Amino acid sequence: MLLALLLTMLLYASLQAQENSFTINSIHMESRPSWEVSNGQKLTLQCLVDISTTSKSRPQHQVLFYKDDALVYNVSSSEHTESFVIPQSRVFHAGKYKCTVILNSKEKTTIEYQLTVNGVPMPEVTVDKKEVTEGGIVTVNCSMQEEKPPIYFKIEKVELGTKNVKLSREKTSNMNFVLIEFPIEEQDHLLVFRCQAGVLSGIKMQTSEFIRSEYVTVQEFFSTPKFQIQPPEMIIEGNQLHIKCSVQVAHLAQEFPEIIIQKDKAIVATSKQSKEAVYSVMALVEHSGHYTCKVESNRISKASSILVNITELFPRPKLELSSSRLDQGEMLDLSCSVSGAPVANFTIQKEETVLSQYQNFSKIAEERDSGLYSCTAGIGKVVKRSNLVPVQVCEMLSKPRIFHDAKFEIIKGQIIGISCQSVNGTAPITYRLLRAKSNFQTVQKNSNDPVTFTDKPTRDMEYQCIVDNCHSHPEVRSEILRVKVIAPVDEVTISILSGNDVQSGDEMVLRCSVKEGTGPVTFQFYKEKEGRPFHEETVNDTQVFWHHEQTSKEQEGQYYCTAFNRASIVTSLRSGPLTVRVFLAPWKKGLIAVVVIGVVIAALIVAAKYYFLRKAKAKQKPVEMSRPAVPLLNSNSEKVSEPSVETNSHYDSQNMDVEYTEVEVSSLEPHQENGRLP
């Protein structure tokens, strides 16, 4: 009902406003007490509006408050001033504020006003325990409920009565609190924890003052360890030495700490199930030194040290020998002695084997006698051992054998292995390989197994092995190993001795050669487009010749040759082509010219004769056709063929008296003649 009444009033006011004229003269904001306030201070933001209207009553308008362009308060009013109240200002209230007035379709907004809130409220700090044992954990809770996260927290662990910060932790939380664990160290006694909070205002961080927690009392988990030495006064070698380290443990402790006794850095005794650790040993002078007792549990460690001095009963024995390096067959002499020459029991040992129970020991050295020797001297319960002395007995090397691993002939450029071996002799053995009497390689071998050198010989080569070891005898040489190297055929060429142009009838000599190749080499001569060689020859040389006595045009063309030997990787190598041209001798050319000219002349004579005969026949034909037929004297098979015979018959007046008329016949052109004659 109330809502309906309110809507009716607003509608009425709106209608009234539409009927009346109005204008928004001005609008601005004010902050009470100011635009810069302290944290927690009450703040009132006012929006002041000046409106002119023709209405007798004030028009109803809407006032909106914005912070950083976000609406924070909205009210409808007819008053000139409207307020937005913040009871306790905080850092998150800081920002840029403005207000807007809306009256019907008219609207006006103020400029932006910067509100600054100075200071940060004090945080609260609590601890989860007020008493803690060394090695424990204290959880600190630092909170600030007034401000909005993210909030920056800084917590410090401080020893009461000092200004030294023992540990500091920082964390930015998206909540209003933070929980941070602090370990309790052995140097901690009475602690307080300080907390500081910070809030980001724009680009500036505003921080609070430090606030301190309640006191936290630290109890010792265990005390500093203490030493007890027995016997308490002078300790002589042979006495039983007892070193005890003890510690006091807090009654709240749920387990014992670990107790460690060290001499220098070596651990000599430990205990994990007791309040003490004991190191007991028969005293020797080497037990003198600094002893440290450490008590450790998690992060807690405490230690104390003591110096122990032990009086020497007699010095350590010394083992002397004739030489530390002997040739096999020489005498090995060992002697054990103690300074001051006290009465003692002696033994001489090789590793763990007792060789003698006297001060001296001698024998003929063999290779198996190599090893570490020592001696002992004992007085009462005290037994001391000398330093270890190395002895090496060298067996002389046997003459080395030398051999290579090639199963077939060695081809130039291939890798071969040259092996050397001395079957007998003390290792390590130094092998030195000579190649062509010059040092090639040196290798040391720790056994009598063969040693292998690799090489790529390019020609016949001699190898020799030299071996040496610890023996005093001079180095030993092997026999000389001779290696024969065969070279494959390389660069086949073909040439002609008389030049590429050969005169017909002369001798033609072709030469096929290789740059390199171990014989025997097989050469083959080919003519282009012929599948089989026309000449083949195998020689122990790098070249071969082919002779042809009488050269003719048949020998003209392109030639090539091939060559191969047993070292050839491919079947054969082929030369490039050689072009041979055959030309005629000058006298042959002249003879041919004479013959040709003679043939031409003969042909011309025959042609001329033939021509004149034809012409004569052509003249005679019309005469024969114009005279009467002449009786045949012979049978029908006889013919009158010669014009001279016919002429004679005309003048034979005795046989026949005939009148005739001479007719002059003009000569015809050959084509006309052929056209008219049958």
Swiss-Prot record:
It comes from the Eukaryota. Disulfide bonds join 47-99, 142-195, 245-293, 336-375, 420-465, 512-561. The keyword Membrane applies. It is a single-pass type I membrane protein. One of its GO terms (molecular function) is protein homodimerization activity. Residues 40-126, 135-213, 225-309, 315-391, 413-472, 488-577 form the Ig-like C2-type domain. Keywords: Cell adhesion, Cell junction, Cell membrane, Disulfide bond, Glycoprotein, Immunoglobulin domain, Membrane, Phosphoprotein, Repeat, Signal, Transmembrane, Transmembrane helix. The chain crosses the membrane at residues 590-610. The Ig-like C2-type domains 2 and 3 contribute to formation of the complex with BDKRB2 and in regulation of its activity. Cell adhesion molecule which is required for leukocyte transendothelial migration (TEM) under most inflammatory conditions. Tyr-660 plays a critical role in TEM and is required for efficient trafficking of PECAM1 to and from the lateral border recycling compartment (LBRC) and is also essential for the LBRC membrane to be targeted around migrating leukocytes. Trans-homophilic interaction may play a role in endothelial cell-cell adhesion via cell junctions. Heterophilic interaction with CD177 plays a role in transendothelial migration of neutrophils. PANTHER family: IMMUNOGLOBULIN FC RECEPTOR, PLATELET ENDOTHELIAL CELL ADHESION MOLECULE. This is Platelet endothelial cell adhesion molecule. It comes from Rattus norvegicus (Rat). The lineage of its organism: Eukaryota, Metazoa, Chordata, Craniata, Vertebrata. The gene is Pecam1.
